[in-house]
């Protein structure tokens, strides 16, 4: 999933130089570092103190503003603060998307974009969800995931006053199957959902 996302998403982000960007659910800074390298002024927000510490190490404390916060609560950010918001592989962990989209719309500047990448909800039919290994314990962790239909994203965004600019579904192709034996079992299934909303 990450390989497919990292191949497809950058082309949708455009020129970020000089933009104020919010990385929602930034985790360990996988995208935060790329956003900073692209010349953006970046704020990363995540509920996990440990992940934010890793993001700070990856990006550099002086390069980014990192905020510890639960996305289920109103964002501790000012109205109209951002030109672009990125939510990469995060929203499946949010139970109700509507309050989050209202908050994202609130912190958008006029004509700002909200870019969302997400595991396609069809993957839940295959009992596939986010999983990672905790480096401290060595245990596999499966955070709570919600199989939001595509319409949940669209309706939450429209309800928050955003418009739909882009929606695409991406399958595992032959290139990914060659690069990853695990990817082959998902051939023919939509794996990645990409959406862009406009304020």
Identify the function of each model-found stretch.
Residues 75-84:
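A short acidic, Gly/Pro-enriched loop at the edge of an enzyme's catalytic core
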Residues 22-24, 28-73:
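Class I SAM-dependent methyltransferase SAM/SAH-binding core
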Residues 84-97:
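A short SAM/SAH-binding and catalytic strip from SAM-dependent methyltransferases
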Residues 98-113:
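A short glycine-rich, Lys/Arg-flanked "PGG" loop and its adjoining helix->strand segment in the class I
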Residues 163-199:
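Conserved Class I S-adenosyl-L-methionine
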Residues 145-168:
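Short alpha-helix
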Residues 1-19:
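Conserved alpha-helix/loop element of class I SAM-dependent methyltransferases that forms part
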Residues 113-139, 144:
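Conserved class I S-adenosyl-L-methionine
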């Amino acid at each position: 999933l990450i390989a497919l996302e990292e191949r497809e998403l950058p082309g949708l982000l455009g020129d970020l130089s000089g933009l104020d960007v919010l990385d929602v659910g930034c985790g360990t800074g996988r995208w935060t570092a790329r956003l900073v390298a692209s010349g953006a002024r970046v704020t990363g927000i995540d509920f996990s103190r440990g992940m934010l510490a890793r993001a700070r190490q990856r990006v550099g404390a002086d390069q980014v503003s990192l905020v510890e916060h639960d996305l289920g609560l109103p964002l501790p950010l000012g109205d109209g603060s951002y030109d672009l918001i990125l939510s990469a592989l995060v929203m499946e962990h949010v139970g109700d998307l509507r309050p989050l989209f209202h908050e994202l719309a609130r912190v958008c500047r006029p004509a700002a974009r909200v870019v969302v990448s997400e595991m396609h909800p069809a993957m839940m039919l295959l009992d596939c969800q986010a999983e990672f290994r905790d480096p401290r314990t060595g245990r596999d962790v499966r955070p709570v995931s919600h199989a939001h239909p595509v319409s949940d994203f669209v309706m939450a965004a429209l309800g928050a006053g955003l418009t739909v600019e882009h929606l695409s579904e991406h399958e595992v192709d032959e290139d990914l199957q060659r690069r990853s034996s695990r990817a082959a079992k998902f051939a023919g299934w939509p794996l990645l959902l990409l959406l862009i909303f406009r304020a």
